[in-house]
């Protein structure tokens, strides 16, 4: 009896001593990195924040405190480095070995499997090479037709929602637009999310994205084993099955249609249409001389839908929100639209006209500087690495802070001023500005994303004057209304004057505003 009690007391102590010794060895290797002092067992978990919004704010504070450079923090005995030094970012992103994603991406495996986002090693290399032609110019033109069609529907939805000077949450509306675009381009199947927001598949997408964000920063639910014991697990399983059944069903129907000369396509409206979809390119692709398996096709289609939906929602939403706060910028954009589009401002914009919109391009670059759709990229060190002379031990997670780069005054003059012209006057050096990452694991769909962003914003600017939720929120001096990256005294001053419609930025896998992005729309009269 006493031996059992003694074992219960001693075993945790031995375990604690083991982890403390391992962490002490790692701290010695990492001593050149500045950061907040960890406490036993917790590390810095007691100071980092309780939710993604608080954690993002803490990261900005620590970054400022430690010279706007890399910094080290600990969650328990797990070491994490927030990387912001362009030279070291260049090494990491160009590395052919340091390509394993951080453990936060494990939350995506039940849904996405091991597609391009979550895989590594030889599978990732082969699939990357195979998928690259899917974003060829000719295929993008087919995708652009889908973007134009859905942008027109989106304007109709916005006119109804914003009638009578109503304040709307633009982030909420953009979510359904981008879901329609991505499902149509990925599989050739319209799901009509803008009109049927309560459909089972639309709700499944929303619920799955919420679940991933919720679990990412929960100390216990991040574990699959622990999560399986919670009340939310059964609903999660149902959501997962809905998404899997939907995608596999479309794949099987498309295979049947191809094998039967498309004869069934004319009789089943849920089948993919004749425009080239991402699914079609996968069905005609090979790896090592063989066709892709159904599971491989499922993984890549699901990955494309996840990456192309959440990130583009963020990009479109924050871009239009910035228009509401910066009317001078909006006027310049509208003038350019008039010059390029001519008298018929209601028609669809062509591929060639998009290319002529130079100020729109500058605007999107500046919007992505201050509100990057993907604020952080995670890498896991599967062995010790020498990163430009700094030894980073095995087991360390690297958080590549793309969002912090945009607020670094050593890279961008007056970073808290929103000024698209800066990208025309002085271009940042490589790896100082990374809205779509860089290197071998850069965003494979960046041309797709930029085309959708430009198409939607062009249509919004031509259709509406975008206004802030209340007039007092107009920026009269071009300053951003964020307090992130400011000196402590200025941050306190800005926080004290926070308006209820100022966004509360939250960063998990993509950037969002926890309280929405509120604005008004006034229809333009031609």
UniProtKB/Swiss-Prot annotation:
Binding site for heme: 307, 443
Alphabetized UniProt keyword annotations: Endoplasmic reticulum, Heme, Iron, Membrane, Metal-binding, Microsome, Monooxygenase, Oxidoreductase
One annotated GO molecular function: oxidoreductase activity, acting on paired donors, with incorporation or reduction of molecular oxygen
Any GO CC annotation of this UniProt entry: endoplasmic reticulum
A Pfam family hit: p450
Cofactor: heme
InterPro entries: Cyt_P450, Cyt_P450_CS, Cyt_P450_E_grp-I, Cyt_P450_sf, Cytochrome_P450_Monoox
EC identifiers of the protein: 1.14.-.-
Source organism, top-level taxon: Eukaryota
Localization of this protein: Endoplasmic reticulum membrane; Microsome membrane
Gene3D superfamilies, sorted: Cytochrome P450
Topological type in the membrane: Peripheral membrane protein
UniProt record similarity statement: Belongs to the cytochrome P450 family.
Biological role: May be involved in the metabolism of insect hormones and in the breakdown of synthetic insecticides.
Name the record gives this protein: Cytochrome P450 4e3
Species, as recorded: Drosophila melanogaster (Fruit fly)
Gene name as annotated: Cyp4e3
């Amino acid at each position: 009896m006493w031996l059992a009690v003694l074992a219960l007391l001693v075993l945790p102590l031995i375990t604690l001593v083991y982890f403390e010794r391992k962490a002490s060895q790692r701290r010695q290797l990492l001593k050149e990195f500045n950061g907040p002092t960890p406490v036993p067992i917790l590390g810095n978990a007691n100071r980092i924040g309780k939710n993604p919004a608080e954690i993002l704010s803490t990261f900005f504070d620590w970054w400022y405190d430690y010279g706007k450079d890399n910094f080290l923090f600990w969650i328990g005995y797990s070491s994490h480095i927030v990387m912001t030094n362009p030279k070291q970012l260049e090494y990491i992103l160009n590395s052919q070995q340091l390509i394993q994603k951080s453990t936060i991406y494990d939350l995506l495996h039940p849904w996405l499997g091991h597609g391009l986002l979550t895989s590594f090693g030889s599978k990732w290399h082969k699939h990357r090479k195979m998928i690259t032609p899917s974003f060829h110019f000719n295929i993008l033109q087919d995708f652009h037709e889908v973007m134009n069609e859905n942008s027109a529907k989106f304007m109709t939805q916005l006119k109804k929602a914003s009638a009578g000077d109503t304040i709307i949450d633009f982030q909420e509306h953009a979510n359904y637009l981008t879901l329609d675009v991505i499902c149509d381009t990925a599989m050739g199947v319209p799901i009509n999310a803008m009109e049927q927001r309560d459909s089972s598949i639309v709700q499944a997408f929303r619920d799955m994205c919420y679940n991933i964000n919720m679990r990412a920063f929960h100390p216990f639910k991040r574990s699959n084993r622990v999560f399986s014991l919670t009340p939310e697990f059964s609903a999660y399983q149902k959501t997962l099955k809905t998404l899997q059944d939907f995608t596999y069903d479309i794949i099987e129907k498309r295979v049947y249609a191809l094998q039967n000369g498309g004869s069934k396509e004319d009789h089943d409206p849920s089948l993919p249409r004749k425009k080239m979809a991402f699914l079609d390119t996968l069905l005609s692709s090979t790896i090592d001389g063989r066709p892709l398996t159904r599971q491989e096709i499922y993984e890549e289609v699901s990955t494309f839908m996840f990456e192309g939906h959440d990130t583009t929602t963020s990009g479109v939403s924050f871009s239009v929100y910035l228009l509401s706060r910066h009317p001078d910028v909006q006027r310049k954009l509208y003038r350019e639209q008039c010059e390029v589009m001519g008298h018929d401002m209601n028609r669809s914009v062509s591929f060639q006209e998009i290319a002529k919109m130079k100020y729109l391009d500058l605007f999107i670059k500046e919007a992505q500087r201050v509100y990057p759709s993907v604020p952080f990229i995670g890498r896991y060190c599967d062995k010790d690495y020498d990163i430009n002379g700094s030894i980073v031990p095995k087991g360390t997670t690297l958080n590549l802070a793309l969002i912090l780069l945009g607020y670094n005054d050593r890279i961008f003059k007056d970073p808290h001023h929103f000024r698209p012209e800066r990208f025309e006057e002085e271009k940042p050096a490589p790896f100082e500005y990374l809205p779509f990452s860089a290197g071998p694991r850069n965003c494979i769909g960046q041309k797709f994303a930029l085309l959708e962003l430009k198409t939607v914003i062009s249509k919004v600017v031509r259709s509406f004057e975008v206004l802030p939720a209340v007039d007092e929120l107009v920026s009269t001096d071009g300053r951003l209304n964020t307090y992130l990256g400011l000196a402590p005294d200025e941050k306190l001053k800005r926080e004290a004057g926070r308006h209820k419609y100022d966004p509360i930025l939250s960063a998990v896998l993509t950037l969002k505003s926890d309280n929405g992005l509120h604005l008004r729309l006034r229809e333009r009269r031609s």
